[in-house]
Amino acid sequence: MSGWPRIYYKLLNLPLSVLVKSKSIPAEPALELGLDTSRPIMYVLPYNSKADLLTLRAQCLAHDLPDPLEPLEIDGTLLPRYVFIHGGPRVFTYYTPKEESIKLFHDYLDLHRSNPDLDVQMVPVSVMFGRRPGRQKGEENPPLRMLNGVQKFFAVSWLGRDSFVRFSPSVSLRHMADEHGTDKIIAQKLARVARMHFARQRLAAVGPRLPARQDLFNKLLASKAIARAVEDEARSKKISHEKAQQNAIALMEEIAANFSYEMIRLSDRILSFTWNRLYQGINVHNAERVRQLAHDGHEIVYVPCHRSHMDYLLLSYVLYHQGLVPPHIAAGINLNFWPAGPIFRRLGAFFIRRTFKGNKLYSTVFREYLGELFSRGYSVEYFVEGGRSRTGRLLDPKTGTLSMTIQAMLRGGTRPITLVPIYIGYEHVMEVGTYAKELRGATKEKESLPQMLRGLSKLRNLGQGYVNFGEPMPLMTYLNHHVPEWRESIDPIEAIRPAWLTPTVNNIAADLMVRINNAGAANAMNLCCTALLASRQRSLTREQLTEQLDCYLDMMRHVPYSTDSTVPSVTAGQLIDHALQMNKFEVEKDTIGDIIILPREQAVLMTYYRNNIAHMLMLPSLMAAIITQHRRISRQEILRHVEVLYPMLKAELFLRWSKDELAAELDKLTEELLRQGLIAVKGDELHINPSRSRTLQLLAAGARETLQRYAITFWLLSANPSINRGTLEKESRTLAQRLSVLHGINAPEFFDKAVFSSLVLTLRDEGYISDTGDAEPGETMKVYQMLAELITSDVRLTIESATQDE
């Protein structure tokens, strides 16, 4: 590029460099999209805009991609490196330039015909300034339609800092030429496909237009389901039809979001400023699969785990910065207090009560509102656990909203609904101290403005955040496979509950929890906490801690928990240095070296972070515990032990393997333990390597408290086979509390009611007990004896003496 064009672009770039601060999606386009910079690259943009072209150029230069303003020279022919699909509108509409995109496509394809070694990568790129979807009434032109020069000037001036450059996966023109030919018809088809691609991309980034709130309410009131519920309300409460209708409108006001693009923009500015000061980084993985779903027209339902109130903001922030529409979020009604409620509502929150029982009008209004969101094409987010996890582990799923999602499918909508499980992880959760108090019996404090301000005042260095998108679950595919007859239940008017709905919803919920855990993220904090809590004195020398972290890291890298889980790429030493900056640990120095200590008052809180990744290390920890306690044991015996205990572990920690897959997984773990030198093999038997016994014992400690808890329940069941389920849960908790006091067990979830409730349900499902009691003492005693060999003698004596004391 030379002469006047260079001067023109330089002059135009002066105001753009001040006004525009764009973001690249994905963050590393060459790496994430597999672009080969040694091969020719040309860019395709939706319409003629020099502002878009220069914004693209800035991102290309920042990411070491070819400059779009520098032409491509191929076989002595100079061709522009960019193609505008559409000429774009003009200020003076009587002048319409001739479109050149088809000619350029044809020129590129023709060069491939004459040069068999040529392979140009065609990269579609869209540049967006602002993402306001507009309202369904009163706005003729949505802001993302093609803008003329004057309109573009104002868009760039006002929205230049809310802009992004979206790179799409490249298309091989060599493949196009070989498969479809190089004539002009193919060039026209290529341009048409590109137009459709950009239209879909705009919809994925902006979402459908927003309804006027009153119009939405009127439409809901006109639905047959709500009309019938209003009549029932009037009849059952002996009130007028108008009063019942007012009640329905009041419920809509309570529930419905009031989405505002300007509030999203403002919040993005505030959160960007806040995150950069509080977090040392937000790590996002597998976002491309969600962008692809949005591009393909799926109705996306985000299903994250729930760690903190911060989840609402973090996930919307991440999605917005991935070029996706922030979802409508189901938030607990407890968050609907001033000023948080109105703010959250404008950010897309719709509010849900803890229970729908006994209020048919409320459940009908909520279900119809949720169905309306789906039918209009808005993405939705809800926490399938129902509330925040107080222990750091996943809670048993609450299936009400999930059931309504499937009922929405049974209304006969055309867009496919896909559930996207999401693992959210933190190195610091601001509520963790409150969680520990609640687990010890303190009353949950009601959310309010003073509480929110106290929480905000405690925000300090929060370390790193993690958002990992798990394997999506297309609902239609799932139902086709598991309930082939599901289409017979489609009813566009009534919300029906076919016999297959409840068991299917339960299975989907359990599968989602497994997929959330599959996307787990190990980090400096949860790895260091796991190692230090494994030590009896909650302290290790720096060398011991480094060795233990190396053990965990190697285990997770060489035998990954799943293809979606993530492990830090840095060294153990770097992880320790980072964790020490979080000010959770103490360091004592002596003449020999550093001792890293987890203070007693912090130990209970740090179990939360350990529990975030307990599932990722449970199987290797259990193997290590079996080998450590037996000293010498065959592979077959290890498999037998694991197969007996696995159903309980799977239900408690939502582990991913079926029983048939255990043998292969244990073989891989055995090879890794041998590779690390933690164990040795003699014949068919595995035994401890004395020189690495401390590392193996610390690894085994990850299963210690779980095995103790199982031993408690199986001992009580063996001692009193006729005990009923409720009593078994209660006595197990009482004995667990006693054990925690006598043996210094710091984990508050050790005697958590939900953990024992889940365990007892699994024992029923596995046939150890019936609903009325009547356990088979022979079987339960066998399992107890197996567990007794895996726990220390002092703990075993405490457990066995409990029933004797009675």
Curated annotation (Swiss-Prot):
Group of enzyme by EC: transferase
Motif HXXXXD motif, per the record, lies over 305-310
Location of this chain's protein in the cell: Cell inner membrane
Q: What keywords are assigned to this protein?
A: Acyltransferase, Cell inner membrane, Cell membrane, Lipid biosynthesis, Lipid metabolism, Membrane, Phospholipid biosynthesis, Phospholipid metabolism, Transferase
Q: How does it sit in the membrane?
A: Peripheral membrane protein
Q: Name one GO biological process term.
A: fatty acid metabolic process
Q: Per the record, what is one GO cellular component?
A: plasma membrane
Question: What are the GO MF terms of this UniProt record?
Answer: glycerol-3-phosphate O-acyltransferase activity
InterPro entries for the chain: GPAT/DHAPAT, GPAT/DHAPAT_C, GPAT/DHAPAT_LPLAT, GPAT_PlsB, Plipid/glycerol_acylTrfase
Its pathway is: Phospholipid metabolism; CDP-diacylglycerol biosynthesis; CDP-diacylglycerol from sn-glycerol 3-phosphate: step 1/3
Q: Which Pfam families match?
A: Acyltransferase, GPAT_C
State what protein this is by name.
Glycerol-3-phosphate acyltransferase
Query: What is the organism field in this record?
Result: Enterobacter sp. (strain 638)
Gene giving rise to this polypeptide? plsB
